[in-house]
């Protein structure tokens, strides 16, 4: 059975720079693991009032995470922090699957997670937040995170061009993630 890596792209915009980075990371994983992308665009804002019955979008996100061996988050920087959409997703996924045991296993429990980001500033702050958050929600951070800036021409033509050093970093990140789940 093939190992599975779930990609979470933090920008819901079609063709976002972080989605373009994810496509490059997918190339680095080609032939090594099965990659899928999580569509969490229908996820409601977290509220305990919505936990029972389980919202279909929450159930689908949990199922996708449960069958994955690892998660790779591609996160823009919004005001030097995690995008609200990603934080909301992690809030849902970190909740105990059995609500009668609030410290019980979650969909994210012990998952291997790595993070990459395309943004023009704030990578250090963003990565520090993820490095604090990931162990708190009982995941295992893997390897060094990859940061990239948006090339100037991308603002006009919407085409991200990653520098060779970034592509090499994504290759190393992919290798570290594959090794973690073997």
Language-model-detected regions and their locations in the chain:
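N-terminal beta-loop-helix "entrance" segment that forms/cooperates
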Residues: 39-56, 154-159
């Amino acid at each position: 059975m093939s190992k599975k890596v779930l990609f979470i792209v933090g920008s819901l915009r079609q063709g976002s720079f972080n989605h373009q980075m994810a496509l490059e990371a997918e190339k680095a994983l080609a032939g090594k693991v099965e990659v899928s992308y999580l569509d969490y665009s229908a996820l409601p804002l977290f509220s305990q009032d919505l936990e029972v019955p389980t919202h279909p979008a929450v159930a689908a996100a949990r199922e996708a995470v449960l069958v994955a061996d690892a998660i790779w988050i591609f996160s823009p920087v919004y005001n030097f922090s995690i995008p609200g959409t990603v934080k909301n997703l992690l809030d849902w996924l970190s909740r105990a699957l059995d609500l009668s045991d609030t410290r019980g296993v979650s969909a994210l429990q012990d998952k291997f997670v790595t993070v990459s980001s395309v943004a023009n500033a704030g990578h250090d702050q963003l990565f520090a937040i993820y490095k604090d958050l990931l162990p708190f929600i009982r995941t295992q951070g893997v390897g060094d995170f990859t940061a990239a800036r948006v090339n100037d021409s991308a603002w006009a033509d919407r085409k991200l061009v990653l520098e060779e050093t970034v592509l090499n970093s994504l290759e190393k990140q992919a290798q570290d993630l594959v090794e973690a789940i073997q």
